[in-house]
């Protein structure tokens, strides 16, 4: 039977090299704080307890993760990783297996960590890297047993050539860690209490020490600056792109796909290059997403098409709908089956019924559009009076002529026609034509100033130029 597990996440670092006012663990990875990714990994292991050791910006860090069931432990002075773990140990029973993670190592997976929990001694997570600069080296004896971890600043030239490095992640019993942490010394180049010195302490009391390797190259990469953050972001995105491809979502250009949340999808879906999916995104069967699209917290049903460079946020697109290109569906938009929203159309808190169309250059806000209604190019629902929003209701099979303004609150009846250029300020009845525009007037002989340098029709008896000045003699 597995011992109960307590996870300790070290998140006290200030992150000076980030050049940011935010604590390092709040830096975003795929749209979420670094620490959130580590917490998700920790909770996936089913621990009895999760402890986060914080320091710089602790209030910010805790507030950003208030929904997580964790214990917050302050490290008042940053005296090293060993000291940080020691701060959390008083709350952990001796019989618990303690897994130590880092808030700036977000790529490690639960599958990699489970073997550390299955051991009965001190289990280390190691990696082989082509350039070990900056890492602590794992030193073995002639029999291959782990004898020490030597930090970069304390390593001699021979030790620095070792390419087997310590990732910093380890597991041991709480009772053992408590004993080892009490014996730590800060007699080193940094003047800190190193957690890695637990190796020597474990060997001294006969506790087995094992080093297990990561299952994926770069999985335990830490983040100290924006360059490394960008590298980890790229690795994260490539990992998810590969998983989505394996799960049946076609990504036309996987290296140009960004996920900042989660996506569920049906069969035969395709996502073109340069698309970004944020929050919770659900794609039905056969959904086609064009290049440069941004999808945020939305549902797109079977057979719908989203054209290039469209933004869809907190919206619901029904089956068989066509949207875009260059459309913007804002929060509260619902398109029912077969509706169409075309290029340079913006919607907000609007419902378009089955088969309704707004194909060009239109704004539909706070509106209910009936089935098969057609909104001509340049139609605007004037929903805001400077203080409050008002709704527009358009009946089924209504036709709104191009360039019309519907001043809410207003209703257009079923099968009504609104003449092009109308400014509608009162309800339009069903089965009727409503026109609200001035008649066109023709002025014979008019020539625009670009042709004549003057306005109005030519007149030999006109003594006053168009500019209003005196006539030249």
Swiss-Prot record:
Question: What taxonomic classification does the UniProt entry list for its organism?
Answer: Bacteria, Pseudomonadati, Pseudomonadota, Gammaproteobacteria, Chromatiales
Q: Where is this region: Disordered?
A: 439-473
Alphabetical GO CC annotations of the entry are: cytoplasm; membrane
Q: What is its EC number?
A: 2.7.7.23, 2.3.1.157
Record text on cofactor binding: Binds 1 Mg(2+) ion per subunit.
SUPFAM superfamilies named among the record's database cross-references? Nucleotide-diphospho-sugar transferases, Trimeric LpxA-like enzymes
Report which reactions are catalysed by this protein: alpha-D-glucosamine 1-phosphate + acetyl-CoA = N-acetyl-alpha-D-glucosamine 1-phosphate + CoA + H(+); N-acetyl-alpha-D-glucosamine 1-phosphate + UTP + H(+) = UDP-N-acetyl-alpha-D-glucosamine + diphosphate
Nucleotidyltransferase as UniProt keyword = yes
Q: How does it associate, per the subunit comment? A: Homotrimer.
Protein name, UniProt field: Bifunctional protein GlmU
Subcellular location(s) per record = Cytoplasm
One matching Pfam family is NTP_transf_3
Q: Which InterPro entries match?
A: Bifunctional_GlmU (IPR005882), GlmU-like (IPR050065), GlmU_C_LbH (IPR038009), Hexapep (IPR001451), MobA-like_NTP_Trfase (IPR025877), Nucleotide-diphossugar_trans (IPR029044), Trimer_LpxA-like_sf (IPR011004)
Residues reported to bind UDP-N-acetyl-alpha-D-glucosamine: 10-13, 24, 75, 80-81, 102-104, 136, 151, 166, 224, 330, 348, 363, 374
Gene designation per UniProt: glmU
The reply to whether Cell wall biogenesis/degradation figures as a keyword in the UniProt entry is yes
Concerning NCBIfam families, the annotation shows:
glmU
């Amino acid at each position: 039977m597995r011992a109960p597990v307590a996870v300790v996440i070290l998140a006290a670092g200030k992150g000076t090299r980030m050049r940011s006012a935010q604590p390092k663990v709040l830096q975003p990875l795929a749209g979420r704080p670094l620490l959130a990714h580590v917490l998700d990994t920790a909770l996936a292991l089913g621990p009895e307890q999760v402890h986060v050791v914080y320091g710089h910006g602790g209030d910010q860090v805790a507030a950003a993760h208030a929904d997580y069931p964790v214990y917050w432990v302050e490290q008042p002075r940053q005296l090293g990783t060993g000291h940080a773990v020691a701060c959390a140990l008083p709350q952990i029973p001796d019989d618990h297996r303690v897994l130590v993670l880092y808030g700036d190592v977000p790529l490690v997976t639960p599958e990699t960590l489970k073997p550390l929990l299955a051991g009965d001694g001190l289990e280390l997570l190691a990696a082989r890297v082509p350039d070990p600069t900056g890492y602590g080296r794992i030193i073995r004896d002639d029999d291959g047993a782990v004898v020490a971890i030597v930090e970069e600043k304390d390593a001699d030239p021979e030790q620095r050539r070792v390419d087997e490095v310590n990732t910093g992640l380890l597991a041991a019993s709480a009772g053992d860690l408590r004993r080892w942490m009490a014996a730590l010394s800060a007699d080193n180049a940094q003047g800190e209490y190193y957690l890695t010195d637990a190796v020597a302490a474990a060997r001294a009391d006969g506790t087995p020490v094992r080093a297990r390797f990561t299952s994926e190259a770069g999985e335990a990469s830490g983040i100290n600056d924006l360059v490394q953050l960008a590298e980890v972001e790229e690795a994260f995105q490539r990992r998810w792109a590969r998983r989505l491809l394996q799960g049946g979502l076609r990504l036309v250009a996987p290296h140009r796909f960004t996920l900042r949340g989660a996506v569920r999808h049906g069969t035969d879906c395709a996502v073109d290059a340069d698309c970004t999916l944020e929050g919770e995104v659900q794609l039905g069967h056969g959904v086609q997403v064009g290049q440069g699209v941004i999808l945020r917290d939305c549902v797109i049903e079977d057979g719908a098409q989203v054209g290039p460079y469209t933004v869809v946020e907190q919206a619901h697109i029904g089956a068989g709908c066509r949207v875009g290109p260059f459309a913007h569906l804002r929060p509260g938009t619902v398109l029912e089956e077969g509706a169409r929203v075309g290029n340079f159309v913006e919607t907000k808190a609007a419902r378009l019924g089955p088969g309704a169309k707004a194909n060009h250059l239109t704004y539909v806000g706070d509106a209910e559009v009936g089935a098969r209604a057609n909104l001509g190019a340049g139609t605007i629902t004037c929903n805001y009076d400077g203080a409050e929003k008002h709704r527009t209701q358009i009946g089924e099979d209504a036709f709104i002529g191009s360039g019309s303004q519907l001043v809410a609150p207003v209703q257009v009846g079923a099968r009504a026609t609104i003449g092009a250029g109308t400014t509608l300020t009162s309800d339009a009845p069903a089965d009727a034509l409503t026109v609200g525009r001035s008649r066109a007037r023709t002025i014979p002989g008019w020539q625009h100033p670009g042709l004549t340098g003057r306005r109005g029709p030519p007149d030999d008896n006109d003594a006053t130029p168009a500019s209003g000045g005196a006539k030249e003699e």
